[in-house]
């Protein structure tokens, strides 16, 4: 069930920025990510967190906040940013444990993910 929620959140986000056929965009990305995860486990982790790219994670959160406020002022899509934060937190932890990022970089990421 969690995978369905995650995929539909990604589809809603893409629809919000004007991509009508979000499934067509996501299908190859999701297929490749799932295949790598099944074959490589946590070794398949890529992206800004595994690179320690704090600025990109911050930009993602700012963009999600802007999109959510512009599209749904009633907060209907607030779950998307909450999911991003939860998954970013978990990914940071896994990357630190697997020595993909240093403890110092992990702390910087945690400060961006959970600024309060």
Predicted regions and their residues:
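Helical "substrate-binding/catalytic lid" subdomain
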Residues: 1-76, 80
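Long, low-complexity C-terminal extensions of enzymes
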Residues: 54-58, 64-116
């Amino acid at each position: 069930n969690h995978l369905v929620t995650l995929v539909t959140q990604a589809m809603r986000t893409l629809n919000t920025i004007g991509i009508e056929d979000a499934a067509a965009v996501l299908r190859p990305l999701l297929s490749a990510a799932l295949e790598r995860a099944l074959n490589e486990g946590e070794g398949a982790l890529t992206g800004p967190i595994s690179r320690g790219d704090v600025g990109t994670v911050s930009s993602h959160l700012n963009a999600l906040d802007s999109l959510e406020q512009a599209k749904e002022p009633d907060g209907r899509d607030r779950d998307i940013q909450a999911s991003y934060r939860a998954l970013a937190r978990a990914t940071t932890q896994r990357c630190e444990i697997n020595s993909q990022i240093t403890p110092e970089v992990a702390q910087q990421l945690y400060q961006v993910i959970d600024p309060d």
